[in-house]
Amino acid sequence: MGELLSETADGVIVNVRAAPRSSRAGLDGMVGDALKVRIRSAPVDGKANKELIEVLADAFGLPKSAVEFKSGETSKTKRLLLRGVTKETILSRL
């Protein structure tokens, strides 16, 4: 999948490994070259993806509209664009 963070003109693309059906929601360290994010929802009808966007937006102080899927919507391994932030901002909050 490449590196954890890729800076673009629009923001930063983050590699994420989703852990659905977790007992708690939030960031949970690294798994290989991806950020592990725990989410409570099951991966049914897009509920887990919606919660994933909420968790990332909250963790990095962004509005939900600033978090967008680039790939992997039906996979545990995903790439999301975080608009309006830099690599340094994200790394400082990990």
Enumerate the predicted regions with their spans.
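Contiguous, often N-terminal, cationic amphipathic patches that form binding interfaces
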Residues: 1-54, 59-64, 68-73, 78-94
